[in-house]
């Protein structure tokens, strides 16, 4: 029975999500699932699957259009992003000596596609929450839900990451006391994580040294010396 469920889960993830899900958001869903009611959890999972399928279709259509536009491009002088600024950023690397004229053009197109994809993923989170204005927490959601965007975790405000992870948990599934201390990755500075920290701001939990286990001292009770009794 376990093998069958495992196979179905793997097929669903492969077919609905083009990228691997970030462990941070996966942990939140797992913890929520443990305390959720069966009916509420099933509805939440179905809704998430529909959102993932819709996003996968949008991403596929997006990249198909991008490839077609690249093949049809003939004007390499006009760009959405300033080439001078891109070239200045490239020169910030001390190891870079010379930059060809074509390199900033390629970077400009790559940055444009990166912004478009991140916006598409962020807008999906906006519609998921039935809003019409894209907010910074939507960008945080796109970052935490996409494995290839892990390098952006450090520049996204922690409050937005925390709200995104807690917002993915169905209401009434986690007690208030547990929600206040979850997830481990967003504890204030100087606070030691409780239990297994998992992922902490995109870094493995090993960034915090585990507290060593201190066993209880075993004291041997020595019997008081008794004077020898003369027979």
Swiss-Prot record:
Keywords: Activator, DNA-binding, Nucleus, Transcription, Transcription regulation. Coiled coil: none annotated. Ubiquitous. Present in etiolated seedlings. It is found in: Nucleus. GO terms for biological process: abscisic acid-activated signaling pathway; gibberellic acid mediated signaling pathway; positive regulation of photomorphogenesis; regulation of seed germination. SUPFAM superfamilies: Histone-fold. Residues 211-231 are annotated as: Disordered. It comes from the Eukaryota. PANTHER family: HISTONE-LIKE TRANSCRIPTION FACTOR CCAAT-RELATED (PTHR10252), NUCLEAR TRANSCRIPTION FACTOR Y SUBUNIT C-3-RELATED (PTHR10252:SF106). Heterotrimeric transcription factor composed of three components, NF-YA, NF-YB and NF-YC. Interacts with NFYA2, NFYB2, CO and RGA. Interacts with REF6 (via N-terminus). Belongs to the NFYC/HAP5 subunit family. Stimulates the transcription of various genes by recognizing and binding to a CCAAT motif in promoters. Interacts with REF6 to directly regulate SOC1 transcription in response to flowering signals from photoperiod and gibberellic acid pathways. This is Nuclear transcription factor Y subunit C-9. It comes from Arabidopsis thaliana (Mouse-ear cress).
């Amino acid at each position: 029975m376990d093998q069958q469920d495992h196979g179905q889960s793997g097929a669903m993830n492969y077919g609905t999500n083009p990228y691997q899900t970030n462990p941070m958001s996966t942990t939140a869903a797992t913890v929520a699932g443990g305390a959720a009611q069966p009916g509420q959890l099933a509805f939440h999972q179905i809704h998430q699957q529909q959102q993932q399928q819709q996003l996968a279709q949008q991403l596929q259509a997006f990249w198909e259009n991008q490839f077609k536009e690249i093949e049809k491009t003939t004007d390499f002088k006009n760009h959405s992003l300033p080439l001078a600024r891109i070239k200045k950023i490239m020169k910030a690397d001390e190891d870079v000596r010379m930059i060809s004229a074509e390199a900033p053009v390629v970077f400009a197109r790559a940055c444009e596609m990166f912004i478009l994809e991140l916006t598409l993923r962020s807008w999906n989170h906006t519609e998921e929450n039935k809003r019409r204005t894209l907010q910074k927490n939507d960008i945080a959601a796109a970052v935490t839900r996409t494995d290839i965007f892990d390098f952006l975790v450090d520049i996204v405000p922690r409050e937005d990451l925390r709200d995104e992870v807690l917002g993915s948990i169905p209401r009434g599934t986690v007690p208030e006391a547990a929600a206040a201390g979850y997830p481990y990755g967003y504890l204030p500075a100087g606070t030691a994580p409780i239990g297994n920290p998992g992922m902490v701001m995109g870094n493995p939990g090993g960034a915090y040294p585990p507290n060593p286990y201190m066993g209880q001292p075993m004291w041997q009770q020595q019997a008081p010396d008794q004077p020898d009794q003369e027979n």
